[in-house]
Amino acid sequence: MRSYLLAALLSITLFSSFTTKKNEQQTLVYNSKIQTEINRDSIIEYAKKYLDVPYKYASSDPKKGFDCSGFVNYVFKYFDISLPRSSGAYKNIGKAKSPEEFKVGDILVFYGYKNRKSIGHVGIICEANGMKSKFIHASSGKIKSVTISALDSNHYSNRFYKCINVLPK
């Protein structure tokens, strides 16, 4: 009788150990799957949730509104990517890409509309097609909200400074 009880306890212990390890492996697979889902398209999908949020100077709060760098900073922060909070700070980060290299999720950097010596605007490419790409950004212009614009419009193509990749390789 004692040996049956010992065998039963041993069986339960072994069975529960295998079950725990199986669950741990499933959790690891699940977590690695989540990590692979953070890609360029998911960044744009997340950014588009904020379309029509009003423009608000010096803000990175979706409840109050965004300015351009606040919007870019907020979107990438969700994916644990730290970026400058000021559009001017983008002048010295990243290596400029040629239009053929533009990808969804890259950041477009623009001169100010009054001054071609300083950086005044940033946005995120949401449709990559070289200088005909489209980008999502917080616009202080007529629209005064998060919107999608064409890079090849006169307003933006004339102010274009560079395109950079900020995503890990």
Specify the residue positions occupied by each region the protein language model found.
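Short glycine-rich, flexible loops that bind phosphorylated cofactors or substrates
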Residues: 116-117
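A generic structural signal for ordered secondary structure
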Residues: 42, 46-50, 74-78, 121
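Intrinsically disordered, low-complexity
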Residues: 2-54, 158, 166-169
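Catalytic cysteine-centered active-site loop
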Residues: 34, 53-104
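Aromatic- and glycine-rich peptidoglycan recognition patches
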Residues: 19-35, 95-97, 120-169
